Amino acid sequence: MNDIYTDIIGEGYPLVLVHGYFGSSNMWCNQKKTFSKHFKVITPSLPGYGESFKTKSLDNIKDMAKTIIKITKENNISKFHLMGHSMGGMIVQEIVKISPKIVDKLILFGTGSIGDIPGRFEPIDVSRERLKKDGVKSTANRIAKTWFVDGDKAKNFYLCEEAYQNVNQETGDCGLVAMKNWRGIENLKDINQETLIIWGNLDKAYNYEQVKTLNENIKNSRLEIINGCSHNAHLENIEEFNNLVLNFLGK
């Protein structure tokens, strides 16, 4: 656990942000700047990813969730707002399942409740095969291009390149296995937190059915759609994304 990088910035009520597959703490850089004016913002890099690339990766969502819970305990954070993106959205759903009382408001961004991700631009098994055949950097680059409307020409694509620079083959495969084997749809009815669901309408990883399922099954939830954005809406329309989150959190 000691090699897990966690950035903590700002003061006030804690807000924990959990990145997705091939992500890092720094993928939230455009959120940290804004949110830290109102909150204590905690952004870990998951084991094997980003700044935690030296830490052994995990191959299941539950262990990733337990890792985030442990980080909050180590930093004496007993209750917090929680946001997860993509695979991070699976992790935060699992955190709510394990320890519902520690989570205040919940934000599910570009994510779903079925780990195999029906409607994804390619099945997870295909990504695993391509990872084996093409290697980690080539696969990460190919996948990350789908996260932006403008592909690798997007202004903030470089953040993805930085994030996957040191990720190894094992971590790449572990993440895909973790997602494929996870399922949270049956637990949605038990989520009592006030929940904001954010989705870019051009997302190629998660289609509308996935976020609609979240919205219909989480009783106290609302869905906000950011038009003209893909999977990484927080890096494409930063202002609209940040405003949605701050308004939801009452700032």
Locate each region found by the language model:
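Active-site loop/oxyanion-hole signature of alpha/beta-hydrolase fold enzymes
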Residues: 33, 42-83, 243
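Gly/Ala-rich beta-loop-alpha elbow adjacent to hydrolase catalytic centers
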Residues: 84, 88, 92
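Flexible "cap/lid" loop of the alpha/beta hydrolase fold
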Residues: 93-98, 103-133, 138
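Conserved alpha/beta-hydrolase catalytic His-Asp/Glu region
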Residues: 116-122, 133-189
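Short beta-strand/loop motif that positions the catalytic acidic residue
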Residues: 191, 197-199, 203
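Catalytic histidine neighborhood in serine/cysteine hydrolases
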Residues: 208, 212-232
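Catalytic histidine-centered segment of alpha/beta-hydrolase-like enzymes
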Residues: 229-238, 242
